[in-house]
Amino acid sequence: SGLIISLGEWVLRSACHDLHKINQHSAQPLRMAVNVSVMQFRQPNFLDVLDRALSESAIDPRLLELEITESVAMLDASFMIDLLNRIKGLGVSLAVDDFGTGFSSLSYLERLNVDRLKIDLSFVRQMEQSDGSKRIVETIIQLGRSLQLELIAEGIELESQAQILTAMGCHEGQGYLFAQPLELPILLEHLHSH
């Protein structure tokens, strides 16, 4: 509905504005990822909305990453490939979120020209109990590395999970092991004091 589109635009603008504030308080540039829905991508003015959010916030576009789901690949392929290439032309990076849970297609993965794969937390959480989950995580990491994609594992809660992922060659991780979600004022205070 129209409300979802308006909300998505507000989230994107707010995220860019907050990223500007965060980087004013950070000793090194920090990147932010924003989930974008299939409905947003379908909007004919999406690129204009993104470009406006970047200019209004005055952020370096290389610090913004848009997270897309595998379902984006199910849209008109030529339209999506063109749109994603134009987004990358602005300097914004792209990540496939929750990789391995949707319509994983190697041909789409190559054609969509993404920068990063985010390994779904359901596999990460189960990899110490399930050989199948562990093999899936390892396979995604090997695939990503062979395609020269950055990899990030979602939902890391235990040091043992982080160690396994590091040994497998995963580049980055996110989850409660590292930090819980923080409200912007608390994050800014944390950045200022460190």
Predicted regions and their residues:
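EAL-family c-di-GMP phosphodiesterase catalytic domain
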Residues: S37-P44, L63-S78, L90-H194
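Short, conserved SAM-binding segment of the class I
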Residues: S14, L83-R86, T139, L143
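Catalytic-core regions built around general acid/base machinery
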Residues: L50-A53, D82-L90
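Catalytic core of bacterial c-di-GMP phosphodiesterases, primarily the EAL and HD-GYP domains
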Residues: L3-F79, G155
